[in-house]
From Swiss-Prot:
It is an enzyme of class 2 (transferase). It comes from Cordyceps militaris (strain CM01). Cordycepin has antitumor, antibacterial, antifungal, antivirus, and immune regulation properties; thus, cordycepin has important value in commerce, medicine, and scientific research. Its EC number is 2.7.1.-, 2.4.2.-. InterPro entries: P-loop_NTPase, SAICAR_synt/ADE2_N. Keywords: ATP-binding, Kinase, Ligase, Nucleotide-binding, Purine biosynthesis, Transferase. This is Bifunctional cordycepin biosynthesis cluster protein 3. Nucleoside/nucleotide kinase; part of the gene cluster that mediates the biosynthesis of cordycepin (COR) and pentostatin (PTN), two adenosine analogs with related bioactivity profiles as both mimic adenosine and can inhibit some of the processes that are adenosine dependent. Within the pathway, cns3 catalyzes both the first step of cordycepin biosynthesis by phosphorylating adenosine into 3'-AMP via its kinase activity and the conversion of adenosine into pentostatin via its ATP phosphoribosyltransferase activity. The gene is cns3. One of its GO terms (molecular function) is ATP binding. Pathway: Secondary metabolite biosynthesis. GO terms for biological process: purine nucleotide biosynthetic process.
Length: 871
């Protein structure tokens, strides 16, 4: 290798991303390579390997200098440094760590999430320094090695990463790479503009043809911008282009287009425009320097979210207001958090702020914080359309000037609209409601936790989430929340001294541009000082609770609040959430593995109860995922998992309980034993002789040979085994029993492992769905996002009955129990469960516990006692 092409590979990344596997493999392939733990200490100052990780222990800022690009080795050869960050999804990292003999606090779930966010999950260091990222969880070892080597041998592609590094990228660079006013050879711009005007400036256009022509006379370069943007014209030979795909009131969004790499295919570059807007005041402005302040604030709020394990699409931000973000699916929903009756609530709900039934004297809601949903409407409409979607809109705005454009076109022609509150029932079809409430609460409880520590509070705020409700994609800073001092003094009341949000500008408008810059900068300084003085690895990483959980505990303890059952249950769950648990005592995370086993058992019950029984596709998928995860956690190699075949199951299914000519029959030992004995005598020709005392052996007298032979066959001997009814199906499936005398309410709610040979109806008992006495039950009000919860022993029968009523199985959940299901309704002050099932004989239990029958699932005489023989 010549000096001009010599290079050294340096791998960085979170624990378990594959560094220790890749380094020896690449060295064996002839590469010069280093990674943390496998580096040359004498070269540390020259190439920066181990010390690179220290960047994850400090807050993100723009004071970090450049990394070395090359060095001279001991042989005097000048070598390029090829620096690559390795990544893998969190579950992959955890599965790999599960195979290690021990782990420490640096490898807990919360640590892996945080440092992945700082390294590359949100790619802060990768985005800042312009480093390529390779996901080792998606490729084999050979594929990963090939990708690393290909990158190392392609300086042109690596230069593209460097060019797009947030450390050096400026808004001017973005404008140059977008080159919206470029003159493309061979285009007749004047003629093409007239064609576009004719097509786009019709009845629903905010602009008349004369508006566009007049502005182009004042600004000739606008002609090129309008045509280029409309027709997506650009230099097709350019190795790198930024194509603007979206522009809004506060942001421009670009896609990277380059023939050199697909690395940026799932990323977007966001530019925060130096703008501010208030719908309530119908005012807008540009404030020089605001982009940098918003970006710095976003960095600090993202730091809080990273510490709490909350995902955001932002990878990294710069002081220029530039952001690398992951592309994601979005919805029209804005999720709003409210603690006080202020802002929109105060102005929309007349008198609510002073109503003692709704609010406290502090302005807080008596029922505590709540989350609502808004439909994101255009700020203005013109002739029934959103004028901002016009292909000329933002280019005309930039050319005319923001304030002049607003006055002439929006105030003068369009009508204000703005976002509107939307009922949850309408949100379900576009965004997961309960997950959105959960995650929005986590976001603002986390922020509240940190703000309280410096004497501030967030009173309300808004975020935007993906359809799952679990990934945030919107801006997060002072611009999207209301932040005040907790203790307002006489000197701050009536002034802006205790206000750190957009209310400063709402109150003063353009006259307070400098004031809002000053207040937002002050807030950034307070947050930075506090977070820098409490680094994650010394505080949250070793804490037993999450930031949002600690604030949830405070809210639960607030005696002035009367929380609703829905939110109390949410806060109780958040208060006990702990992501700091460590793996220990073996090669697997025992606690997680045990939980996986319990989940698999529960999903088996759900699959058993599927309607019809064989239509359990969704549950089958869930069980496969859980089983594969469990296999990884206990160290079973993937090759062994895939090698398992039907033959392994057939071996068990073919097992016989007893030798030919003999049968083992299970019979109940206690409840309904008298009914079992009566059936055996009447239908099987057998008188069961049950023991007394502690003896367990059951014998019998043969009373009717013909009935016995019909039931069991000629020449067959039978012995009886006292068995719990709910154990019978499993014992039959495993071949431990050949048959069982039991009820259809048992056998018909398990997988079909036996056939009914003989039976007698029981006219004394029925099966019913039970409710709290007099409670209204409307299955049509159940939904997938807010499903009804039902406690049931007889899941299959319950599902079949509800299906007969036309109730979708996606709108309710069955919690399987093995007995005393009524107790879950009786001892449930939060009313978590709506219904339970029960076998009813006299009805005494439901009467004494203030319950009644909602629906009869099986009438008296429809439940059978019978002999079931293994199939």
């Amino acid at each position: 290798m010549s000096e001009s092409t010599a290079y050294t590979i340096i791998l960085h990344g979170n624990d378990a991303t594959g560094k220790s596997t890749l380094v020896p493999a690449l060295r064996a392939a002839g590469e010069v390579i280093y990674a943390r733990g496998d580096d040359d200490a004498t070269l540390e100052d020259t190439i920066v390997v181990r010390s690179f990780d220290k960047f994850t222990l400090r807050l993100a800022d723009d004071d970090r200098g450049p990394l070395p690009q090359s060095y001279t080795d001991k042989d005097g050869v000048q070598r390029r440094i090829v620096r690559i960050i390795l990544d893998a999804d969190l579950d992959v990292l955890q599965a790999r760590l599960a195979k290690r003999p021990s782990t420490d606090q640096w490898e807990s779930e919360k640590s892996l999430f945080y440092f992945r966010a700082r390294f590359l999950g949100h790619q802060e260091l990768a985005a800042y320094h312009g480093l390529p990222v390779i996901n080792t969880g998606e490729k084999s070892l050979d594929e990963t090695m090939a990708e690393i080597i290909a990158l190392a041998r392609n300086p042109e592609t690596l230069a593209l990463f460097s060019k797009l590094a947030l450390r050096t990228l400026t808004p001017e660079d973005v404008a140059s790479l977008a080159d919206r006013r470029a003159v493309i050879a061979g285009v007749d711009y004047a003629k093409r503009l007239e064609d576009i005007i004719a097509a786009e400036c019709g009845e629903t256009s905010l602009f008349t043809p004369e508006d566009v022509r007049a502005q182009c006379l004042e600004d000739p370069g606008l002609v090129h911008a309008l045509v280029n943007h409309h027709d997506n014209l650009h230099d097709a030979e350019a190795p790198l282009r930024l194509r603007q795909i979206v522009e809004g009131e506060s942001k421009q969004i670009y896609k990277v287009e380059s023939p050199l790499t697909h690395h940026f295919d799932n990323l977007v570059l966001v530019f925060l425009k130096p703008t501010i807007y208030s719908h309530s005041k119908q005012a807008t402005a540009e404030i020089s320097g605001l982009s940098a302040v918003r970006a710095s604030g976003s960095r600090l709020f993202l730091e809080m979210l990273h510490r709490a394990g909350i995902s955001h699409t932002y990878h990294g931000l710069s002081a220029h207001g530039l952001i690398w973000a992951r592309s994601t699916e979005i919805t029209q929903i804005e999720t709003v958090y409210k603690e006080l009756c202020a802002g929109t609530d105060k102005h929309s709900f007349f008198g609510m702020a002073a109503d003692p039934n709704v609010t406290l004297p502090t302005g807080q809601y008596k029922r505590g914080p709540y989350v609502r949903f808004d439909w994101r409407n255009p700020n203005h409409v013109y002739n029934g359309v959103n004028p901002a979607t016009h292909p000329f809109y933002h280019l005309m705005e930039a050319s005319v000037g923001k304030n002049a454009f607003y006055d002439k076109y929006l105030t003068g022609r369009a009508k204000p609209l703005g976002d509107k509150c939307v009922p949850e029932e309408l949100v379900h079809s576009v965004q997961a409601v309960e997950a959105s409430v959960d995650w929005t609460t986590r976001i603002f409880f986390t922020i509240q936790h940190y703000l309280h520590q410096i004497g501030l509070e967030v009173q309300d705020g808004c975020v935007m989430l993906d359809p799952t409700g679990r990934i945030m994609w919107s801006e997060i800073n002072q611009d999207c929340m209301r932040i005040k001092r907790r203790e307002r003094t006489e000197t701050t009341n009536g002034s802006h001294q205790g206000v750190f949000d957009k209310d400063v500008w709402r109150a003063g408008g353009s006259s307070v541009k400098e004031a809002i810059l000053d207040k937002w900068t002050q807030l950034n300084g307070l947050l930075r000082e506090h977070l820098a003085g409490r680094p994650f690895h010394e505080n949250e990483m070793v804490a037993a609770f999450e930031p949002y959980g600690m604030h949830a505990t405070e809210v639960l303890a607030d005696k002035t609040l009367t929380l609703t059952p829905r939110y109390r249950a949410l806060y109780e769950r958040l208060a006990t959430h702990d992501r700091s648990l460590l793996r220990s005592g073996g090669s697997a995370d025992k606690a997680a593995s045990e939980r996986l086993l319990a989940l698999m058992q529960e999903h088996i019950w759900q699959a058993i109860a599927a309607v019809p029984p064989l239509n359990g596709h969704d549950e089958a998928k869930r069980m496969v995922r859980l089983a594969n995860t469990f296999a990884r956690r206990v160290g079973l190699p993937p090759a062994e998992v895939s090698a398992l075949s039907d033959a392994d199951a057939e071996t068990i299914l073919g097992r016989t309980a007893t030798p030919p000519g003999s049968k083992a029959i299970g019979v109940t030992a206690n409840k309904y034993a008298d009914k079992t004995d009566e059936f055996a005598l009447a239908e099987l020709g057998i008188k069961l002789l049950r023991p007394t005392g502690r003896c367990l052996r059951i014998t019998y007298e043969l009373v009717d040979q013909a009935k016995y032979t019909k039931a069991f066959g000629a020449g067959v001997t039978v012995h009886f085994v006292p068995t719990r009814p709910k154990d019978m199906p499993g014992l039959l499936a495993q071949g431990m029993l050949d048959g069982a005398v039991t009820y259809s309410s048992v056998m018909d709610n398990f997988p079909t492992v036996a056939r009914l040979v003989a039976s007698t109806p029981d006219a004394d008992i029925s099966l019913a769905l039970i409710r709290r006495r007099g409670q209204a039950i409307d299955p049509h009000g159940w939904s997938a996002d807010r499903p009804a919860r039902i406690v049931a022993e007889h899941g299959r029968m319950v599902r079949a009955h509800l299906a007969g009523l036309g109730v979708s199985p996606t709108t309710y959940e069955i919690q399987h129990v093995l007995g005393s299901s009524e107790s879950y309704l009786v001892n449930d002050p939060r009313e978590t469960y709506l219904l339970c099932d029960a076998v009813i004989a006299t009805g005494g239990t439901i009467q004494e516990n203030d319950l009644d029958v909602w629906q009869v699932v099986k009438n008296k005489g429809e439940l059978l006692v019978g002999l079931y023989q293994r199939v």
